[in-house]
Amino acid sequence: MLFKIKKGLDIPLKGRPDERIDVATDVKTVAVLGSDYIGLKPTMLVREGDQVKVGTPLFEDKKNPGVIVTSPAAGTVAAINRGAKRALVSVVIAVDGDEAEAFACKEVAAASEADVRKVMQESGLWVAFRTRPYGKIPVSYTHLRAHETS
């Protein structure tokens, strides 16, 4: 199906936009929210007061060992907030610095499926995947295929 637009809509705006870019203020605290990870039962790997770097493991899923959530910022763990039945509400990090963990990874062409899965789990990228239809994090041993389909 092809759509052709014959006429557009000219909105009569007067003036021009300001040609400036505002610099945002630095963030003082960030939080990893437990509600972002449906069905995850965390085993905490850090405590309040611990120093973390970007990519430092914060907690791991009890039900799926190997599924790790990492720190989005470098700094100090300011608070670990729990709710009813000790459910994780948030892990608050007071931002200080920009140090990051280094992860060893191979060239994509030379890496095996297990190598890619291991790096994704260690770096915290695995939790970006979601299963359907409930939006949960996939188990650590899920077989992933990445190929072009028609």
Language model feature labels by segment:
Residues M1-L45:
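N-terminal, Lys/Arg-enriched amphipathic/low-complexity engagement segments
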Residues T25, D36-L40, V52-G55, N64, ...:
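Generic structural motif
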Residues V46-V52, R82-A84:
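Acidic, glycine-anchored pre-beta loop/turn
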Residues K53-G66, N81, V89-G97:
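Short hydrophobic beta/alpha edge segments that flank linear recognition/processing sites
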Residues A84-S123:
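Glycine- and charge-enriched low-complexity intrinsically disordered segments
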Residues S123-G124, R130-Y134:
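Phosphate-interacting basic helix/loop segments used at nucleotide- and nucleic-acid interfaces
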Residues G135-S140:
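Glycine/charge-rich, flexible interdomain linkers and switch-proximal surface loops
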Residues T142-T149:
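Conserved small/polar residues in nucleotide/adenosyl-binding loops
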